[in-house]
A protein has these predicted regions:
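A short, Lys/Arg-rich alpha-helix, primarily the initiator
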Residues: 1-16
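"A position-specific structural signal for the A-helix of alpha-solenoid helical repeats
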Residues: 79-86, 118-128, 169-176, 214-221, ...
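Short alpha-helical DNA-recognition segment
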Residues: 15-36
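DNA major-groove recognition helix of helix-turn-helix/homeodomain DNA-binding modules
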Residues: 47-63
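Helix-turn-helix repeat elements of alpha-solenoid scaffolds
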Residues: 89-108, 134-156, 186-200, 230-240, ...
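Structural motif corresponding to the intra-repeat A-B loop/turn of tetratricopeptide repeats
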Residues: 17, 133-135, 184, 222, ...
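Alpha-helical adaptor scaffolds
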Residues: 176-250
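Flexible helix-coil transition and linker loops at the boundaries of alpha-helical arrays
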Residues: 70, 106-118, 133-134, 150-167, ...
Length: 307
């Protein structure tokens, strides 16, 4: 196996994409840091290296750098926050929120004050978890999400963001912004954001499982919004694409939901038999992967279509 310094790998990919050091590091570090990393004169934090690799769409698990015990603990805490966020979104379990907040506090004790990447992760998580007595209002959530994205993308503008470079967490924030515009009643902006975000991911996503999983998340939300405005043909095509990616990369988090969107679109298009079969697949897939709440929602949706 050929081995090269991580700085050399980053430099090769940056030049392949015709990116300047300034473009790559915007919002997360100084150009001099990139220069020193590429020349092997500096070993930045694991947090920063991961962010750079994500912006370059280079899977971080294929590249190795010396890391300290604290950096490994920070990475572990960040992964736990992501886990509790997903758990809370899927179940609305109060205990998941409690565990997430505890993990925020542990990460804050470990991270440096200037660690914008961890700050952003915590702020995004808080937007998901809401307050003790319920979710934030759409207006409050929008302010939090814009504040979060601009920690590392200071010039972010929702009307033309697709020329930027984004980490995994930044992509999730943009996706959340789109969903929040939907809750604010501005579905046209939500669909526009998801359309451009899906195009960005089509261009930048390589074949690694993690980035493909994020792509299925965006495609599901895009297709779901298209159904809501009556664009059933487009919704079906987008959802099929997401379904095929799930199968291709072996990641099934959004697989039941994509099948359910396809079922709903087929129903509105007058294809009752196809719709019924897809609803059954969606329901049993949700049950099989332990998504009981989603399985129940799919079942209720299927019953409404039969009435």
């Amino acid at each position: 196996m050929q081995e090269i310094f991580i700085g050399e790998a980053i430099k090769r990919r940056r030049l392949e994409l015709k990116l300047t050091q300034e473009k790559l590091c915007e919002g997360i570090c100084e150009p001099i840091t990139i220069s020193r990393l590429e020349n092997g004169r500096q070993s930045p934090s694991r947090n920063l290296v991961n962010a750079l690799l994500e912006r370059l769409d280079m899977p971080s698990d294929r590249y190795y750098a010396l890391v300290s015990k604290d950096e490994l603990e920070i990475e572990d805490l960040q992964a736990k926050i992501a886990y509790w966020d997903i758990r809370f979104e899927q179940t609305q379990d109060v205990q998941a929120r409690v565990e997430a907040i505890k993990t925020h506090e542990a990460l804050q004790r470990k991270m440096k004050l200037e660690d914008r990447i961890s700050q952003q992760l915590i702020l995004r998580s808080l937007a998901i978890l809401g307050k003790e007595d319920g979710p934030f209002s759409p207006e409050e959530k929008q302010e939090m999400l814009f504040r979060a994205i601009r920690l590392t993308a200071p010039n972010f503008d929702v009307s033309h963001f697709e020329d930027g470079l984004y980490t995994a967490n930044e992509i999730k924030i943009i996706n959340q912004l789109a969903l929040n515009y939907e809750r604010l009643g501005d579905q046209s902006t939500a669909i526009d954001i998801l359309h451009r975000l899906s195009a960005y991911m089509e261009q930048h996503c390589r074949c690694d499982r993690a980035s493909k999983a994020r792509q299925t998340m965006v495609l599901f939300n895009y297709a779901n919004n298209l159904v809501s405005v009556g664009e059933y043909g487009r919704a079906l095509l987008v959802a099929k694409k997401g379904r095929d990616i799930c199968i291709e990369c072996g990641h099934y988090l959004f697989f039941p939901e994509l099948l359910a969107v396809m079922a709903e679109a087929e129903s509105f298009l007058g294809n009752a038999k196809d719709s019924e079969e897809l609803y059954k697949q969606a329901f049993y897939m949700a049950k099989a992967i332990g998504h009981e709440r989603n399985a129940q929602m799919i079942f209720e949706q299927m019953k409404r279509r039969d009435e």
